[in-house]
Curated annotation (Swiss-Prot):
Protein's cellular compartments: Secreted
Gene: RNASE9
The protein's name: Inactive ribonuclease-like protein 9
Keyword Glycoprotein listed: yes
Single GO MF descriptor: nucleic acid binding
The organism of origin for this protein: Papio anubis (Olive baboon)
Keywords in alphabetical order: Disulfide bond, Glycoprotein, Secreted, Signal
Length: 204
């Protein structure tokens, strides 16, 4: 049969062999993608912090804004608030879940001014904290399950109270800046609680 093909259709066979012997050509795939500079810088910073083995980097305005401060949107009393926001904002410490965290509904300038308020005892009673003069809305997140990402599970608590923070001096700008959120202390008349159905009840 092969001999018949060669003798009767030599041109067809030649074209077929030419196609088979042609080097395989791979189409170049452009793997580059457009990403805003801010998002890429944030992602690189997250990777650096994620794999860091030394001391935690000192706080910056951008880091506090990204991890602590929130904008109006998702209801603060949503019971899944912490699980969603902690994942979205990449709030972790060296590949492990943070045991607690605070989200505050306020602007950075307002938070920074608290650094110049009077001292009060921190909730652990060891250090001194600065306390806000007015009440601030926020969410307290308490770790309930797992210790390593991405299996962190949190219980969410809406709070409206006085913010306790620690501050640190930043030489570059010659100012005190927020370092950690120590607590969000509710006055007794403003404390939120769960009713019998497990729904958060927020007093006016």
């Amino acid at each position: 049969m092969m001999r018949t093909l060669i003798t009767t259709h030599p041109l067809l066979l030649l074209l077929l062999l030419q196609q088979l012997l042609q080097p395989v050509q791979f189409q170049e795939v452009d793997t580059d993608f457009d990403s805003p500079d801010d998002d890429m810088e944030e992602f690189e910073e997250y990777l650096e912090e994620f794999h860091r083995t030394g001391p935690t980097r000192p706080p910056t305005k951008e880091k506090v804004e990204r991890r602590v401060l929130i904008e109006p949107g998702m209801p603060l009393y949503d019971r899944n608030y912490c699980n969603e926001e902690i994942m979205r904002k990449n709030v972790y410490h060296k590949q492990r879940c943070v045991t607690e965290h605070y989200f505050l509904l306020m602007q950075y300038d307002e938070l920074q001014k608290i650094c110049y308020n009077r001292f009060v005892p921190c909730k652990n009673g060891v250090r001194k904290c600065n306390r806000s003069k007015g009440l601030v809305e926020g969410v307290y997140c308490n770790l309930t399950e797992a210790f390593e990402i991405p299996w962190c599970k949190y219980e969410s608590f809406y709070r409206r109270g006085y913010v306790l923070i620690t501050c640190t001096w930043q030489n570059e700008i010659q100012k005190l800046i927020p370092h950690t959120i120590n607590d969000l202390v509710e006055p007794p008349e403003h404390r939120s609680f769960l009713n019998e159905d497990g729904v958060f009840v927020i007093p006016p």
